[in-house]
Regions:
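Basic, flexible Lys/Arg- and Gly-enriched helix-loop patches that mediate nucleic-acid binding at interfaces
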Residues: 1-232
Length: 232
């Protein structure tokens, strides 16, 4: 078949073209006379649907390129070298265009690890930014020290921050060194402040869920797509 240069570039960037059986994503690649070029039978000129990527961000350490990211978001640096989870069941084909125009919409506190979100979808971006106060986030917090009397009850309901009462949350012991927090409208520094208010020092934080979306199945440094129609 014949097509314009712009159409050909679209087919290639969308992953519809194979050279010797392998998907070719670089339009400028040279193809030899003996090589077999195939266009997928389902190829379309429709723009690729926007995607959302879920990354398990490792804990940043001094000296990491991500820890020193100039844009202040280490997750973006981790994503550049991260690997797609082998059990990603979204059915979405990886395209080069999926890694452009991504917006980080659920960054972690400095030094924390766990689930972060990148999206090209404006609806999801608004959900996780403008409407973030209504979405519950679950965080595992490693602590040391002896909790104050009635400390767990106070964590759940009874603390103040900057002179204002904090809304009720769900806090429980996972084991003798780890607390599980489930809270909405989390603000930077809030968990550290809450723990300090009841005599505990935070050693580490790991976010394991945002709304309905869990981190389960992702190893540190791995990512997967949010399935089409997936919701937070």
């Amino acid at each position: 078949m014949s097509c314009s240069r712009s159409d050909a570039e679209h087919y290639i960037s969308a992953g519809w073209v194979r050279v010797d059986g392998r998907v070719e994503l670089v339009a400028e690649s040279r193809v030899g006379d003996s090589q077999k070029v195939e266009l997928d039978a389902h190829a379309t000129l429709k723009p690729a649907a926007p995607v959302t990527i879920l990354l398990r961000q490792p804990t940043a350490h001094a000296g990491d390129a991500a820890a020193d990211a100039s844009d202040g978001d280490p997750a973006m640096e981790y994503l550049k070298s991260a690997a797609r989870a082998s059990d990603d069941r979204s059915g979405i084909r990886v395209l080069k265009s999926h890694f452009t125009h991504l917006k980080s919409v659920a960054p972690l506190e400095k030094g924390a690890s766990g689930l972060v979100v990148f999206t090209q979808d404006g609806r999801i971006a608004r959900k996780l930014t403008q409407d973030a106060g209504g979405i519950e986030r679950e965080v595992i917090v490693e602590v040391e020290g002896e909790i104050a009397e009635h400390g767990l009850k106070r964590l759940n309901h009874g603390l103040e921050w900057n002179g204002k009462a904090l809304p009720p949350i769900k806090a429980s012991w996972q084991n003798e060194r780890r607390l599980r927090f489930a809270l909405k409208g989390e603000r930077p520094g809030q968990i550290v402040h809450m723990c300090a208010s009841v005599g505990l020092k935070v050693l580490g934080m790991k976010r394991i869920r945002i709304g309905r979306v869990p981190m389960a199945g992702l190893a540190p440094g791995q990512w997967r797509y949010l399935p089409n129609g997936g919701k937070f």
